[in-house]
Amino acid sequence: MRTVLDIEYKEGLAIDLYLPDEGEVFDLFVYFHGGGLEKGSRRGMRPFAEPLAARGVATASVEYRMYPDAKFPDFIVDCAEAVAYMKAHIGEYGQCRRLYVGGSSAGGYLSMMLCFDRRYLEAVGMKPTDVDAYIHDAGQPTSHFNVLKFSGVDSRRVIVDETAPMYFVGMDEEYSKMLFIVSDEDMFARYEQTLLMVKTLEHFGHKDNVRLSYQHSKHCKYVNKIDEAGESVFANIIMGFLEEVFPEG
């Protein structure tokens, strides 16, 4: 595996890139970390990035602005710019076939916002379907609790407005393939919210584009978990999805 750290994609914000060995054709997974939009880091992704690289998928781990210094939608704008930057520059590191976008927890909220509110990727010269597949891991499909909190609203409220990915479902006729991951012991109401998001997509006729992975775990604990066989649980979830929706390899 090759590692390229601290790639500045805009002033003050960087990406860490984990790549397969030189000369290999690969896919690219642009990943947004969790932390409630107020903490977390792009660092420390090697436990799943290394096995993904061994199976032909590079990982670009993205730094983005967070509360309290940021305000909505700064973090979404940053992530859109990171995706566009990597799409434009990944050829400098080798031959890339496909582009995937995803994230865990708050990162899953961010990947959903890019997937469903087309304005963010359109602002950087892309459209959501330019991404071949999305991996939404335990993200909040309603308005994120910290978006509510920092707007002066009770963070326990369930609100579906323009700050919520679910608000935009059905506004586009076409969606890329996508995977939702959720746990039976996830954050309070996250399991039910995820099922509602999936059912809403199905109601609009997109059942064939959606996959759902259930984990027996606490919230996102599988992301850096190694199973009894010594393999990354998260990498295996991702590769299982990709191999299903892209059987040609």
Predicted regions mapped to residue ranges:
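Short beta-strand element of the alpha/beta-hydrolase
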Residues: 25-35
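N-terminal cap/lid segment of alpha/beta-hydrolase-fold proteins
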Residues: 1-23
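C-terminal catalytic histidine-bearing segment of alpha/beta-hydrolase fold enzymes
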Residues: 195, 204-249
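Primarily recognizes the serine-hydrolase "nucleophile elbow" in alpha/beta-hydrolase
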Residues: 84-149
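Alpha/beta-hydrolase active-site loop
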Residues: 70-90
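Short amphipathic alpha-helix adjacent to the substrate-entry channel of hydrolases
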Residues: 43-60
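Active-site-adjacent alpha-helix of alpha/beta-hydrolase-fold enzymes
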Residues: 151-158, 184-210
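The feature captures the conserved acid-bearing segment of alpha/beta-hydrolase catalytic domains
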Residues: 126-128, 133, 139-147, 157-193
